[in-house]
């Protein structure tokens, strides 16, 4: 019965991970650079299912190591290599999720296939550094008992503790702290969005008069509109007669440059205190401010009702605002794409948190008992069947 269950798990592992690799390599929607982590992780799991589990099953069923001693040393090194690689891959994925959520604007521009491949190479090098010492340093080996040969993991305390810390406990601690940080960021973002949904202004934000779009009537002209650009024609020393319509040439006077300073669209204003206050809040502000996230003046920062579209120039006139440049549709489409991307990042982070939590719970008993045998081998020895 055990052999049948393990055989089914081997086939299921190979088939499922092969589908993951095939989907990422063939589906255009899954060709994002971060999905290379899943390809490498699936490859490590396939190697475990093909090169490790069958020999472990044979060793358990026969009760001794049927294969040669050389293959035993290689088999143990590959076992540590592939299992450590799987765990460190999950740690790297959790860090990638954290950077994608906390530093969305900055990290997404740096998340290139080359960068992801370098991280994957680092993961495999860490796993190799943990698995190779038993092959290089044999240490004081106990003589083999007479009878059938056995193939066991390295029993020296220094290697047990160092490999357990590097393979499991350090990555596990990093994953727990990272997902706790992601949870706090999501909770803070949700609590910030609630008062703004009710119409309450942000702390420290003064109430600004509402500027109506072009073509609507304005009952009371705000004082902010009385500028050299507000009364067209006065820059040349005369005004338009009553009843004469304004032309586009009159609205834009070359002799009167706009008095509002330009604010870049690349998010620099947020770093200088216009919108966000920390890298973790950049993604939140990108979603909160909406498609009109870049204000025409510092007084209009982070106020959705007063924002012009991104990439547009705003001129104040007697009738309200005149928008020059790119239209609202393009800016709104870009904002919705960014918001959808951030939503996918958060949803994928939740799924990965569940998967990693189950993975950690499955690995913890082994590494705990394995380390406990090195700390107190006489009094804390775990029964062989339970191990």
Curated annotation (Swiss-Prot):
Region (Disordered): 193-303
Gene Ontology MF terms in the entry: alpha2-adrenergic receptor activity; epinephrine binding
Membrane-crossing residue ranges in chain numbering: 1-25, 37-62, 73-95, 118-140, 157-180, 352-375, 385-387
Pfam families per record: 7tm_1
GO cellular component: cell surface; plasma membrane
Keywords attached to this entry: Cell membrane, Disulfide bond, G-protein coupled receptor, Lipoprotein, Membrane, Palmitate, Receptor, Transducer, Transmembrane, Transmembrane helix
Disulfide-linked positions: 72-151
Membrane topology: Multi-pass membrane protein
Keyword Cell wall biogenesis/degradation annotated: no
UniProt GO BP: platelet activation; regulation of smooth muscle contraction; regulation of vasoconstriction
Domain of life of the organism encoding this protein: Eukaryota
Localization: Cell membrane
Acidic residues bias (residue ranges): 279-290
Extracellular-side segments: 63-72, 141-156, 376-384
Site feature location: Implicated in ligand binding: 79
Cytoplasmic side: 26-36, 96-117, 181-351
Subunit structure: Interacts with RAB26. Interacts with PPP1R9B. Interacts with GGA1, GGA2 and GGA3.
Family per similarity comment: Belongs to the G-protein coupled receptor 1 family. Adrenergic receptor subfamily. ADRA2B sub-subfamily.
Function: Alpha-2 adrenergic receptors mediate the catecholamine-induced inhibition of adenylate cyclase through the action of G proteins.
Protein name, UniProt field: Alpha-2B adrenergic receptor
Organism: Macroscelides proboscideus
Gene: ADRA2B
